[in-house]
Structure formats: structure tokens, C-alpha cells
Amino acid sequence: MNIRFLIRSAARRDLESLMRLAPQASLVNLPPDEDVLTIKIARSLQAFSTSPPASAEYLFVLEDVASKEVMGTSLIIARYATPRTPHYFFEVRDTPGGQELALGVCTSGLSAIGGLVLDRRYRGMPEKRGKQISLIRFVFMGMQPQRFEPTVLSELMTPVAPDGSNHFWDALGGRFTGMSYAEAFELTRQKSRDFIPRHFPVTPISLPREECGLQRNRDQVLDSGKPEQRILEKVGFSFSRRVDPMDGALHYETRLADISIVKNGRYCRVSETTRESCGQSALLGFMHGDRFFGGQYPVQVNADNAALPGEVMALLGLKSGQQVYLSLLD
């Protein structure tokens, strides 16, 4: 393992890097908009403070310390569903003739993860940097569970056409609202989803078997999203049989307390050792003031002591006896 990478909370200096990464993924919560990203960084800095707002969003970046290059991002939204910003979904129900979609709404009890982007140049490598920047969110949630809701949601995107259209939207939402997918996407980015209860039917929508392209199941995930799907399933998430009413994105959910990274996490005191002495691998995280640092590193855990290679201690600025939150990996 090349020990020159760390994960940290986003800083103002990361704006240029985020502007470079954002176009690589069509994400509502990480758009390639300088003004929006500037606000997101400021909101994240406030979130990591000792008294975060209820609407906190936590933005993480994966950095190559040698080159000072940011190559990945991920995000936690502490309160994803509120009375002011409801979370709408379709519940997927199997019927003798196919499926039906029933509109539902949630206004509390839900945190969400998103904003996952890994620079294309680093995808498919054995170090699995994307897995690290994804799982680090659960390290922080394990450190500070009181900041989050009991249930955690991740939306896994379904395919979008080369021209930017979405078959699911064109067949359903576009028909009900008269809007294009791009128009609806922009409203969603602005956290304005009032058009859904205004225009969508309250009675279930039938999808006959011949409409197989509209029916939802766990296999309908973008190829680029399948690694994240496998990661989520391994740590405890499953398809909730709910989908986004706009684009049909699959909703993966679990209880925060049931996420394996959280269940297996604990605080340890660190000490220094050699890399050769470390026969385990772990995700770890800690706060330095209002800033988060962490990553995946070799370790040797004995009771409440975690021995780390000297180069990891130096990279993270850790001192012997300092406390970190740690979750061993298989």
C-alpha cells in the first residue's frame, strides 16, 4: 500500500479541484457550479464545527499528499428529510400483471450519503481509492452518531441517455408535469421538489410487464455505480423497494447502527510500529480541532491499542497515545 493518501474534510482551497471533478458525474448534490460548490464547502466547514446546524452537510476529499491533488469526494447530508424539504419516493410493488409505483413522502428520520466521485484516472486500480472515500463517511458517522438520523439512504443512479434525457422521466414524470428531465433536474438541485406532489397522481401507477424498461429492480444501476452498490450491500445496505420519482434511481437504505463499519468501530490509542508488523487493515478517523482526517491504513490492533507504521503517523500528524476511531476491514 502506497502511504501517501489521506482523506480529510474539505477546505476552501479545494474549490478548483471540485470544479474539475464534478463534471465527471451528474450528481444533484455535487454540480459543476462554482457558486454552489463554494456554498457547499462553507456549509461543510460549519458542519464539522462543534455546534453544527441541523441542516449540516459534511464534504470529504481524498488527497494525494505528495502532489497536493484532490482525486475524490464524498458527502453526508445529516437531515435529508424535513417538513420543509420532504423526501418523495415511489414504493415499488409487484402485481400479477407487472409492477405498480405508489407515491410516498418522508419528513424525518433520514440521513443520506452522496457526492461520490473518483477521478477517472484512479478508477479500477487495486488500491480501491473509491471504496475508501465511500466508506470513510461511515467512520465519521460512527464517531458522531448523535449528529445523524436513525436511517441512512443512498440513491444509486440508473442509466441516462447520451443526450441527457431519462427514459423513466420521459415516460412518467415528463408526462405528468410537461417538463424536460433537465428542467426537473435543475429544480431538484435547488431543493425545490414541490412539483412532485402537485403533478404526480396520488393513486398507484401501473407498469404492465411489457413496460419492462420502466420496472425497477436491484439490477438497474449504472455500470459505473455497481462498485458502490457492492460496497453498500457488503456493509449492510439493501434495496428498499423505493425509487426516486424523478429518474427511477434505486434507494438503498439501512439503519445507521446496523452498518458494519459503525457496528465494528471503536476508539483506540495509537502507537508507532513498523509496516512489517502490521497484519491488519483498518479505516480510521479523528478530529483535529474542527477538521477531520482519516483513511485506510495497515495496522495491528491489540485490545484498545492500534499500532500504526511511522509513515502513517507522520502523514496524519498523529502522536503516540492520541485517540482515533477505527474499524477493521476483512
What spans do the regions from the language model cover?
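Conserved beta-strand-loop-alpha-helix junction that forms the acyl-donor binding cleft
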Residues: 114-121, 150-165, 214-226
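Conserved acyl-donor/pantetheine-binding loop and adjacent beta-alpha core of acyl/acetyltransferases
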Residues: 77-116, 182-190, 197
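Conserved acetyl-CoA-binding loop-helix of GNAT-fold acetyltransferases
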Residues: 118, 124-141
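Anionic-ligand-binding alpha/beta catalytic cores of soluble enzymes and soluble regulatory domains
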Residues: 206-274
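Long, charge-rich alpha-helical interaction segments
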Residues: 172, 181-199, 205-220
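Active-site rim helix/loop that mediates acceptor-substrate recognition in acyltransferases
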Residues: 31-71, 75-83
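A short beta-loop-alpha structural element at the N-terminal edge
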Residues: 6-18
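Short beta-strand-centered segments at strand-helix junctions
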Residues: 296-321
